[in-house]
Amino acid sequence: DLIREHLAAYQKAGISYVRDGGDPYGAGVLARSLAPEYGITYRTPVFAIHRAGRYGKIVGRAFSDWKEYCTLVREVRRAGGDFIKIMTTGILDFATKGHVTSEPLSREEVFAMTAAAHDAGLSVMAHVNGAQAVMDAAEAGVDSVEHGNFQNEESICCMAEHATIWVPTIVTVSNLLENGRYPAETLAWIFETQKKGLQLAFEKDVVLAAGSDAGAYGVLHGKGIREEESVMRKILGAENGQELEKRLAFGEKKIREKF
């Protein structure tokens, strides 16, 4: 019933394509089977893949060595996964400026994981935060970077150079700004870094796509994606509204092609 409720929320919001980020319970596979009833094309990696002891348990399964990673990639294929989702870093620490939880994967590991997924015929969605981690992911050839907080000009130019699709999920922070859950000053600082990152990415012609990270605290299914589009419009200004609409349409087209 809950999955149907979420699908109905997407339908009500006029959304016809949903790409989830994995889960350990099989919910995405069930949602994909039900989605056509709601006029929705649904894509799932079945489960996300993370290194044991690092962030990612909430959305998937862990590997301890290379053999285990390759086994998980094969399991995604056998389960009918539409793509591979890898977790290369932790998440934002909303109480500390500029801090990402969990040690990032090494550059060599990200390259190898991405290549193995592509060799299996599957595109790669990468959960990434931090400028160096974004550069590693883009240069490794991941197909999309999710979140991508705390970037700099070098990492943004790197995404542009490699035609990496960036899904910034700004709404995960903007929806927290006034609810008192985390320190207001820190949230405002994080949001400011997101604004600057989006503005620079827009200037550098990074391929942008709207995504909400729905299910995160304060981000509702269906409504979240419209809030993401709205906050992007506010950040870039009314004068860039039409161009942003074109860019997001192009980004969605590329997402649909790759995933």
Name each model-derived stretch.
Residues D1-Y38, R61-K85, A115:
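Alpha-helical scaffold segments that flank or form the walls of functional sites
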Residues K67-W166, A188-A209, K253-E257:
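Histidine/acidic residue-rich metal-binding segments in metalloenzymes
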Residues P24-G28, H50-A52, G90-F94, N129-M135, ...:
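Active-site environment of divalent metal-dependent phosphoester hydrolases
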Residues P168-A188:
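Active-site loop ensemble at the mouth of alpha/beta enzyme cores that anchors a bound cofactor
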Residues L30-G39, T101-R107, F111, D136-F150, ...:
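Short, electropositive alpha-helical surface patch
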Residues I40-V59, V110-F111:
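N-terminal small/glycine-rich loop or linker at the start of catalytic domains
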Residues D119, Y182, E192-F259:
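His/Asp/Glu-enriched, well-ordered alpha-helical/loop segment
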Residues D1-L2, G53-T71, S123-M125, E185-L187:
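Active-site mouth loops of central-metabolism enzymes
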